[in-house]
Regions:
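C-terminal transmembrane-bundle signature of multipass membrane proteins
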Residues: 118-201
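Membrane-proximal first intracellular loop
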Residues: 1-36, 48, 52-56, 127-140
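Membrane-interfacial loop-to-transmembrane alpha-helix junctions, especially the N-terminal start
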Residues: 1-9, 61-71, 134-144, 200-201
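Internal transmembrane alpha-helix with an interfacial aromatic "cap," most often the third helix
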Residues: 40-74, 83-87, 119-129, 189-199
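Alpha-helical transmembrane segments of polytopic membrane proteins
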Residues: 15-19, 33-47, 103-118, 172-185
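Interfacial non-cytosolic loop connecting adjacent transmembrane helices
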Residues: 23-35, 89-108, 156-180
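Hydrophobic alpha-helical transmembrane segments of multi-pass membrane proteins
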Residues: 2-24, 72-82, 143-162
Length: 201
């Protein structure tokens, strides 16, 4: 299952990257809406399969690593369920043109859990890099890279670019968007590839 999850994630992550880059450059790409929906779901379900499988192969004495995996699985499951609820109007996003209080609370909750998942990924990466060798050590390095890229793309780069060029400067927005898309796609593909190799070993 981990193999298929990794391949599916790679395919749809690259598709998402192409869509983002073309959108930033103003190039029209006609991707069917059903494919975009499948892409969104796969990018959440594949990490659940990979992190869940990785959690199952950990011995009982790896309590810290097991807890980190559980945080990651919970985040992706919660995000997936919430996206389903919003997509099929099980939870209304807006009412009378305004975002509902429930939607605001749930969005804030998933963002908070997302931050915890990034920290959990970093802790898992540091633990693997310090305690293990071979494929587990390489996975640890990949997870640390995920945190570094997240820190640069979400916090450092946007602030720096907008401070230097101005928030309304179209070049700044395009550069940040494309750099984030490329770096996030590559680092996550590498991390999940390393996780797949670790699971197979």
């Amino acid at each position: 299952m981990a193999q298929y999850a990794m391949y599916a994630y790679c395919f749809f992550a690259i598709l998402s990257l192409v869509n983002t880059v073309c959108g930033s450059l103003g190039v029209a790409v006609n991707i069917p809406s059903i494919l975009l929906t499948i892409k969104q779901w796969v990018l959440m379900l594949a990490p659940i399969a990979l992190w869940g499988t990785f959690r199952l192969i950990q011995p009982r004495n790896e309590k810290l690593l097991r807890r980190c995996c559980e945080v990651m699985v919970f985040y992706y499951v919660f995000s997936f369920v919430l996206s389903i609820c919003f997509k099929f109007n099980l939870i209304p996003m807006t009412q009378n043109g305004l975002i509902t209080r429930t939607a605001t609370i749930l969005t804030w909750t998933v963002n908070s859990i997302g931050l915890l998942s990034v920290i959990a990924s970093l802790i898992a990466g540091c633990h693997l890099g310090r305690k293990h060798k071979g494929s587990m050590h390489q996975l640890g390095t990949a997870l640390i890279l995920v945190f570094i890229v997240w820190l640069i793309c979400v916090n450092i780069l946007p602030t720096t670019m907008f401070y230097l060029l101005g928030i309304s400067h179209p070049t700044a927005f395009t550069c940040v968007n494309m750099f984030s898309a490329f770096s996030n796609t590559l680092v996550y593909i590498y991390a999940y590839y390393r996780m797949y190799r670790t699971i197979n070993n």
